Amino acid sequence: GTINGVGIKYNITDFVGSLLISNDAGTGTLDAASANTGIGHEVFDDLTTGDDNTGLGYQALTVLTTGSSNTAVGSAALDANTTGDSNTAVGRCALSANTSGANNIGIGFGAAKTTTTGIANVAVGGNALKLNETGCYNIAIGKDTMEANTTGCYNVAVGYLALDANTTAHNNTAVGDASLSANTTGYINVAIGKSAMAANTTGQGNVAIGGNALDANTTGAANVAIGCSAMSANTTCGYNVGIGFCALTTQVDGGVNNTAVGSCSLKLNSTGDLNVGLGYAAMEANTTAGANVAVGAYASRCNTEGGDNVSMGYAALYTNTTGGKNTAIGCVALCSNTTASNNSAFGVQALKTNTTGTTNTAVGSCALDANQTADSNTAVGSSALSSNTTGSSNTSIGAFSMNDSTTGSNNLAVGRGALDANTTGAENTALGMNALSANITTSCNTAIGKGAMLVAVNGDNTAVGVNALVASNSGYTNTAVGQRAGCTTTSGYANTYIGRTAIGSAADNNDEVVVGAGLTGKGDQTAFIGGSSGAYNAENNAAWTTTSDRRIKKNIVDNNIGLEKINKIKVRNFEYKTKDEITELSADSVINKKGIQLGVIAQEIEEILPEVVKVQSTGVKAVNPDNITWYLVNAIKELKKEIEE
């Protein structure tokens, strides 16, 4: 029937369970349609068999024929839909061009307005997905979101102007006002945050989370930016990671394969490549340098152009600008370095104050802590070389070794406390715990062994053995080899002690030589060599004399043999064979003397006086001329007697 010119149809024979109110109520055949509700001018005008549809508004679902389960609320909502099913359109012109597309939702003025056959799209907001035609499985929430999309599928846009310019790109996610707003064909991007990736056009595979993250990116691909303004200036660079507030914020179009994690990390990077910055402000000032690794708050913060550096720890390599190939691991390690290169620092405060010194290695807490400009030092151990400032080419291994050295160079110290007190002394060698530990300014000492030259303060000494020259303080040019050799000497000089506990006759002796374990010297300018009874004793520039004191001898018997033996000895002239001519002995047996020599043959002497012939380690037989001397004495006595008779 009609009420005031408005037609009302319900429960018609073939229009079961339906209600239609319109001034043009259902001119179609209404064949077998059921459970439909239509209110508005020309609603269901062409409906034939479609069921479960709801159309509210001027020309809502006006050309629907067989489509079912559609809901259209608003003027011209789903206006062109004919066979599409399960669509929901709320708002003027929402889904107005849809013909056969199904399972679409358009809420808002012009939402998904031009969609024709697209399916499973969700558009919520004025003009959301406005130009979409065949794109499928898109979600657009917010005014003008994905407004330009035509065929792009599997996109998600939430926020005003999100993915606004997208046309054909797929698999993008944009959440936040203007996020990915300029994107046209870039795909597989994720942008979350206001203006995140706002300028992106064709860049793909990017992730931007945070306000203005990757804001300027246009074609850069495979970037990850997480944090407000992270990588905000990046345009075309790819394969970078920036995580944290302002991470990689100024990188433009040159840097690739950078990783920045932490607020302001790699903040000023422009064209530097292959950098890793982890921590607050790590490598914040870097611009063009590449292949750096900075881990820790403020690590390599001031670096601009220095490449191939590794810094790990709070403020490690903090002030470095152009220095390259440095390694700093530990809190404030190498933190003062500026332009120096090829340094290695491992440990808290290692090489802390180094500025321009190069090729230094410091391993241990406070190792080379005070070094500034010195080069080529090696310090291994806590506080090793910790006071060094300008001394170069030192090697210090052991806790507190060369701890006080400042300007001394070319020293070697191995062992805890070795050369501990050295300040300016140079060219010293100390191997062993506390070796040369009291040396301050003197040079050219060599101490090998625990406690060797423990209190020495003068130079040009050599001590090899535990506690060798242990008490020597002002002595110089001394040599001691053996455990506790020269251990009683304090101020003597030019002494030589060889053998375990070989010592001088007094603490201040000079020019004394003692060779033999447990021997005590004979005084200034003497030499004492041999076993406990002594073998030789020489004084001043005199010839060697044999120790012959009756008080140290026993079993004394006469030996009157002389002339008979001496007469049998043949004195020969000869030459020594060359190395190539010696065949029966090793080449080590050669004696490098040229010309005619005078002497005896050991094998001939052995037949006469076997006791004076000894076999050396090389197999060569040698003659001891001292014993022959005593036979000569007897021979002279015999001749004298014969002459007198």
Question: Model-predicted segments: where are they?
Answer:
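C-terminal intramolecular chaperone/autoprocessing and neck/assembly modules of extracellular spikes
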Residues: 1-16, 524-626, 635, 639-645
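Glycine- and small/polar-enriched repetitive beta-structure motifs of secreted/surface proteins
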Residues: 1-548
